[in-house]
């Protein structure tokens, strides 16, 4: 039995009329269209030298001196900001004129592969068709059709395949066929070196998956799409694309330590994230800054959960040049399944989501596990970070207060120059900048001692956040003396 997708109300988008079904096939109830995705934002770049670490044997016993070796990490490049929608016709059903405009590599040559995945009652998930024909799509048949998707009518999925990122649209249509056991399930997706512009093709993929359900085997629109958008990337010599073009992914805008991420669709993504987790956002914020491995579990639909992955990444933005080059990149994996276990075993930091409950038992693969609104960790050293302190509640109060002021100005004054996404991203970026700016100034001062006054000025609790600060100093390689009085001592 197919159930209607239970997306949160704040994540319902513009309705897209379903394509007309063939007379012999019943029309599915596909619900609202999922016309949305991740907007563009820059990704991490090497920004300069980090703060040098040293420890002094002459420091008193009440001082925590933190030392950490430096390691260089780099990540995939990004793209320029997306432009506004423009009216007009387009060659591909579902692509706007804006989507087809060519203004440089960031606007063209994005698509590494186009594919159709189907569920076969005898063979399971399988690649039905793809371009180019020799591209390595091993595992994509499971990434683009999440486990448990047979219970919903439609979904969309962001995922990672090697150094590429994918977006697939899934649909489930009832059919009068014993061979297909009453349901036809397919996904149509694309791969790209960057995930920042994948959302542009969401509408096209939705229309194409409906087309494939009604007219299986008709790939002409997908072939034309690929020829128009195909990437020109270096070859590994065997006809397979194996490397991302670093020159093509060169910085276009100013970079931060972590991507300055901005979502423009769907409206309400950040609002839903805040309402869903409430004060626990402050717990997630600390884990994100500490570059922990965060895994989010949820049953399908998984598209909404991919946005939670995105929102978690937004918590770790820092715009101070040179800060964070010694820490692992906080990598969004988006949707993962059991086939990704070997890749996760070598990851130092990531945030991902899954529909497979078995991951909860694989404790060696994650540091933080989120099931619904339940945030937990099996690591004893991280247990104290699950407890909210007064500074956490004060920050959350300020965030909610700023949201209310923004909503009031939008409703009363008609001020639409800012939105909740901007507010959310800037709120945490400013908080992070304040912390690292203070730590940097103390580290290079004549007396590199971090006092309770410094900690309060950073918006942290001198007692409740002491363990968090110790971990932060170690991970980011900042050499300061942390001196905080013990409340139990006179």
From Swiss-Prot:
Domain uDENN as annotated: residue spans: 19-221
Function text: Probable guanine nucleotide exchange factor (GEF). May promote the exchange of GDP to GTP, converting inactive GDP-bound small GTPases into their active GTP-bound form.
Domain dDENN positions: 399-490
GO molecular function, one term: guanyl-nucleotide exchange factor activity
RNA-binding as UniProt keyword: no
InterPro entries, sorted: DENND11/AVL9_GEFs, LCHN/Anr2, Tripartite_DENN
Protein name (database record): DENN domain-containing protein 11
UniProt key word Plastid: no
Keyword terms, alphabetized: Guanine-nucleotide releasing factor
Composition bias type Polar residues, residue spans: 30-43, 52-61
The cDENN domain, residue ranges: 249-397
